[in-house]
């Protein structure tokens, strides 16, 4: 669970640390705005990606399933700055098929946490393999 009050306090401290006045009119709402933004950016922290993939259907064929152009936004775990990307997922079903709507949700859950791009791709692959 996100600690919004802790985030707001940290933003106030950050503003002080860079020489800004957090009580300045233009910055008064910044701590709340950052806490609100982080609640979305970090919604995947603690989430279980395999739960997203729980609903499957019998595979009538074992052809490759491909879904392209899944847009994503994540936060670099080294710099806490956003990065964007596009994921393309292809997999061979093993008697069961994942609903196509579940694949973007999987990407969203895994991207919504402090992340590195190279780890994100491995985590998506690992979740699909399980």
Residue ranges of model-derived segments:
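A domain-level signal for the structural core that forms small-molecule/cofactor-binding pockets
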Residues: 1-130
């Amino acid at each position: 669970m996100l600690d919004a009050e802790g985030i707001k306090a940290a933003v106030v401290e950050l503003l002080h640390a860079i020489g800004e006045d957090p009580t300045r009119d233009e910055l008064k709402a910044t701590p709340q705005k950052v806490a609100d933004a982080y609640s979305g950016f970090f919604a995947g922290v603690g989430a279980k990606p395999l739960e997203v993939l729980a609903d499957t259907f019998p595979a009538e064929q074992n052809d490759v399933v491909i879904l392209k152009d899944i847009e994503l936004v994540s936060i670099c775990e080294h710099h806490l700055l956003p990065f964007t990307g596009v994921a393309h997922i292809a997999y061979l079903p093993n008697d069961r098929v994942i609903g196509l709507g579940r694949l973007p949700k999987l990407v969203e859950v895994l991207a919504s946490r402090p992340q590195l791009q190279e780890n994100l791709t491995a985590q998506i692959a690992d979740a699909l393999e399980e």
